Amino acid sequence: MANYLPSSPAWLAFSQAAKSASRGGERLRIIEAAGLRVDLTAQPQSDSLDNAAQDLLAQQNFDAARAQLYDGGEANWTERRPAWHTALRADNPPPAVAQDILAERERVRRFVRELDQSLAYDCVLHLGIGGSDWGPRMVTRALRHGGLRRNIQFASNVDSHAVADAIGQLDPRRTLVIVASKSFTTTEPLANAEVAMNWLRDAGVADPIKHVVAVTANVDAALDFGISPDRVFRFWDWVGGRYSLWSAIGLPIALALGNEALDQLLAGAAAMDQHFLQAPLRKNAPLQMALAGLANRSVLGYATLAITPYDSRLMHLVPWAQQLEMESLGKVASRDGTPVGVPTGPVVWGMPGTDCQHTFFQWLHQDTTGAPVDFIVCERPDHAYARHHNMLIANCLAQRSALLRGKSYEDILQEIREHEPDLQRAEVLARHRVHPGGRPSNLIVLPRLDAYSLGALLALYEHKVFAQGVLWGINPFDQWGVEFGKLLAKRIIRELDAPSADTSGDQDPSTRYWIDSLSRR
């Protein structure tokens, strides 16, 4: 990159415009995208900020980076591969990968149809971790209100309490086991697969491997594991784990909800892909969310982002978004290896409303720091309790309004003085009740929670994260921090398995103490 970001002209102009922009929500700003409505009214706004954003996008070569994403260029430059998840959900994938994508897509759907017809399995045990787990787990939980075709349980943690809990809810003779791992060397799914195989064997299943399918980019490793070729579903090394939901990793979604649901999920995401590609800057929802997030994180100093879906069915959206945002944007180096020089990805956290209001909203309203909030709500519910849904919407809108508007010391003092004759006490009480306001938020409104709208919502966040990666000049498609931790864990496992080995010089003092102590348990 030609300019060091913090001292580049476009960044300096963007920073100044963000600091001076209005944060009072005076100008209504709602963007329609793939059936969703995204309200950015409560974000920093001004004409000068819009103009500075356009200059920053030009400086960071955004149009070229976006074209590279869609065209299969080397978007993941540190690993020298594309990040072509948009191709996975396209009706007509790019010619270079169309045959492979369409063939594997049809293999997944044919397999689901065959199982539906044979009634061979009414239980599914899904073993994955990270992107191969959170995506299918989140979608299946979000859409199960329409009914599940199979009893599906997910186990990801290498803590065997998790897989024990999952298999305790399944009939081994009627269970299909899915082992989902890009490399097919990942510790957690393979360790849990061993538990599952023993469980099937102990239940009297004559040939447990016939109950197992694999979803992987390493087909040879799955075959070496003993899985039949017709039960190995493939994706490619250019599919990042946190974007793999759109590939054959979506198999458990189709098994649980049907092929039609998976198709609609992809269609919603594809519609958002087209919006992100074609919509102009001021009407581009992912891009405007990215710019608002950039201003909040790198200029205004907000270190975190709260996501509060006012729909309990989206209970797994937050951990899915945590992985997407924090694994993608928790980076320190720009494209040429120099430090980025500004704060990058925020800590993402949250939970569904209205539970969140009784957990952490006090902090959002009155803490000295605060955080931007993404509020998510559906226009229409899938239950018959209309007034309950009105209550849910009212709480969502009220919390957002309170964070934006705040309440001044003078207004609160006037209210307290109506029933408190002691002026000194009234003044003290008033200071405890001040709400600073001016706290940024987005409101994302879905027509209802169906597969199409959910696909659009997930792609909205994916493209927001990609755009922020471009603006910061970082690679949102690698995860070297994760890989380093895995490497160290493998070394420690060897020492725990063979505590007599003399490796005293390989660890820091605390880690050495605990290896020695816990290996004697």
From Swiss-Prot:
Enzyme Commission number(s) of this protein: 5.3.1.9
Keywords on record: Cytoplasm, Gluconeogenesis, Glycolysis, Isomerase
Positions of the catalytic residues: 327 (proton donor), 358, 486
Pathway annotation from the record: Carbohydrate biosynthesis; gluconeogenesis; Carbohydrate degradation; glycolysis; D-glyceraldehyde 3-phosphate and glycerone phosphate from D-glucose: step 2/4
InterPro entries: G6P_Isomerase, G6P_Isomerase_C, Phosphoglucose_isomerase_CS, SIS_dom_sf, SIS_PGI_1, SIS_PGI_2
Gene Ontology terms describing biological process: gluconeogenesis; glucose 6-phosphate metabolic process; glycolytic process
Gene Ontology MF, one: monosaccharide binding
Main location (coarse class): cytoplasm
PANTHER family attached to this UniProt entry: GLUCOSE-6-PHOSPHATE ISOMERASE (PTHR11469:SF1)
The protein, known as: Glucose-6-phosphate isomerase
Species assigned in the record: Bordetella petrii (strain ATCC BAA-461 / DSM 12804 / CCUG 43448)
Lineage summary: Bacteria, Pseudomonadati, Pseudomonadota, Betaproteobacteria, Burkholderiales
